[in-house]
């Protein structure tokens, strides 16, 4: 039985992870977890899964829960996340928190010898060189939970990675894939949160609409699979049936197909290289799709993706700036402070004023992250 540490238990990925664990109680046990502000859902999870250690964000929530669950050890804040991530009895850390707050717990878990299932893409975006180096030194498996990177991992099983010609990441195009740039100026938060194919959290859905999410995934793929940015291509695949593919030097392609359901990559990260049965409401039949559609990305229509490629190629602290600026800009949009159209402009502004620092250490990354957030907040 694998003992799971789950960060971000009440979020979209966390909820679907718990569904897998619920279906397979003989294979998995939740021994520690974290959640943010959703106390009602958090209480229900604690009652059902009976973790031994829990981290919440606010001190007041920790105090409240300590009175309700005297047999559980509680922590709060970032230090609480770090405590839970290194819980001695845990085998696997599944990091599903949103944002760069996931970086330090991941590094701590690697240092503690935990296997890592990574859904927090910001960890690799901001500090990929540090994370991959630490994982290599500790001989730690770093398995992707993102559907695209899980697809690449599956396509590369048994393959010689030196024979990769290109990695192709697929994208749905998000909520506004058929709108022009001019039409984006007046879109609302409600409209932006309607993703055509996937059920995701608010931040991720907005990132999908701008395609910053795909840009972060490009950087994540660069670190996970050691492929140059020029050899990572993004294509629009409207149906979200082909989750990504690899092109090899002989001209052949290997792709992973399946229903757009995050339980598939989550279970694969937890059971790799094995697979589990997943009960679906509707069986996936390839014959239900008379055609699958592919389109080139229009980088003028999706400038966020171009910004992400530029940040990745510049390297150093520039990806940290892009990520931090985007997190603040998206929060501003969700709070009604920023027009959707201006999310990319705020990120570009932050990148233009920053001179990248090469091969940054952890303290430098954290400092640049905080400085960027503070700067972008002044622009809201």
Curated annotation (Swiss-Prot):
The EC number(s) this enzyme carries: 1.1.1.267
Q: InterPro entries under this entry?
A: DXP_reductoisomerase, DXP_reductoisomerase_C, DXP_reductoisomerase_N, DXPR_C, DXPR_C_sf, NAD(P)-bd_dom_sf
- Which pathway does it operate in? Isoprenoid biosynthesis; isopentenyl diphosphate biosynthesis via DXP pathway; isopentenyl diphosphate from 1-deoxy-D-xylulose 5-phosphate: step 1/6
- From the UniProt record, give one GO term of the biological process aspect: isopentenyl diphosphate biosynthetic process, methylerythritol 4-phosphate pathway involved in terpenoid biosynthetic process
* Superkingdom of origin organism: Bacteria
Catalytic activity, reaction form: 2-C-methyl-D-erythritol 4-phosphate + NADP(+) = 1-deoxy-D-xylulose 5-phosphate + NADPH + H(+)
**Which residues are involved in binding Mn(2+)?**
146, 148, 217
Q: Which residues bind 1-deoxy-D-xylulose 5-phosphate?
A: 121, 147-148, 172, 195, 208, 213-214, 217
UniProt keywords, alphabetically: Isoprene biosynthesis, Manganese, Metal-binding, NADP, Oxidoreductase
One GO term in the molecular function aspect is: manganese ion binding
Under the heading Pfam families, the entry gives: DXP_redisom_C, DXP_reductoisom, DXPR_C
Positions with a binding annotation for NADPH: 10-13, 36-38, 120, 122, 201
Which cofactors does this protein require?
Mg(2+); Mn(2+)
Against PANTHER family, the record matches this protein to: 1-DEOXY-D-XYLULOSE 5-PHOSPHATE REDUCTOISOMERASE, 1-DEOXY-D-XYLULOSE 5-PHOSPHATE REDUCTOISOMERASE, CHLOROPLASTIC
Report the family membership.
Answer: Belongs to the DXR family.
UniProt function note = Catalyzes the NADPH-dependent rearrangement and reduction of 1-deoxy-D-xylulose-5-phosphate (DXP) to 2-C-methyl-D-erythritol 4-phosphate (MEP).
Output the NCBIfam families linked to this UniProt entry. Answer: Dxr (TIGR00243), PRK12464.1 (NF009114)
Q: What is this protein called?
A: 1-deoxy-D-xylulose 5-phosphate reductoisomerase
Q: What species is given as this protein's source? A: Listeria monocytogenes serovar 1/2a (strain ATCC BAA-679 / EGD-e)
Q: What is the lineage of its organism?
A: Bacteria, Bacillati, Bacillota, Bacilli, Bacillales
């Amino acid at each position: 039985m694998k003992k799971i540490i789950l960060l971000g238990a009440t979020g979209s990925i966390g909820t679907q992870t718990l569904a897998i664990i619920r279906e397979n109680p003989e294979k998995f046990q939740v021994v520690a977890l974290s959640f943010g502000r959703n106390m009602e859902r958090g209480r229900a999870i604690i009652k059902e899964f009976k973790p031994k250690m829990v981290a919440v964000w606010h001190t007041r929530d920790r105090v409240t829960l300590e009175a309700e669950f005297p047999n559980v050890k509680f922590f709060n804040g970032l230090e609480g996340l770090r405590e839970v991530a290194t819980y001695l009895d845990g085998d696997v850390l599944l990091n599903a928190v949103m944002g760069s707050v996931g970086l330090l717990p991941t590094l701590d878990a690697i240092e503690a010898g935990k296997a890592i299932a990574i859904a927090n893409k910001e960890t690799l975006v901001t500090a990929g060189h540090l994370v991959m180096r630490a994982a290599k030194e500790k001989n730690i498996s770093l398995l992707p939970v993102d559907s695209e990177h899980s697809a690449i991992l599956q396509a590369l099983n048994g393959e010689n990675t030196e024979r990769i010609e290109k990695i192709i990441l697929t994208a749905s195009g998000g909520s506004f894939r058929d709108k022009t740039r001019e039409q984006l100026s007046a879109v609302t938060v409600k409209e932006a949160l309607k993703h055509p194919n996937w059920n995701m959290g608010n931040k991720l859905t907005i990132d999908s609409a701008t395609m910053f999410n795909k840009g972060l995934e490009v950087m994540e793929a660069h670190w996970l699979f050691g492929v140059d940015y020029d050899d990572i291509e993004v294509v629009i695949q409207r149906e979200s049936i082909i989750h990504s593919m690899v092109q090899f030097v002989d001209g052949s392609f290997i792709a992973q197909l399946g229903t757009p359901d995050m339980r598939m990559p989550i279970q694969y990260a937890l059971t790799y290289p094995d697979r589990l049965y997943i009960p679906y409401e509707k069986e996936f039949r390839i014959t239900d799709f008379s055609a699958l559609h592919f389109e080139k990305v229009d980088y003028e229509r999706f400038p966020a993706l171009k910004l992400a490629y530029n940040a990745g190629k510049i390297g150093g602290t520039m990806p940290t700036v892009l990520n931090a600026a985007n997190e603040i800009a998206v929060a501003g949009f969700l709070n009604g402070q920023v027009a959707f159209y201006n999310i990319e402009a705020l990120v570009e502004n932050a990148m233009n004023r920053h001179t990248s620092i090469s091969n940054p250490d952890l303290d430098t990354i954290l400092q640049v992250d905080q400085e960027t957030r503070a700067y972008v907040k002044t622009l809201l």
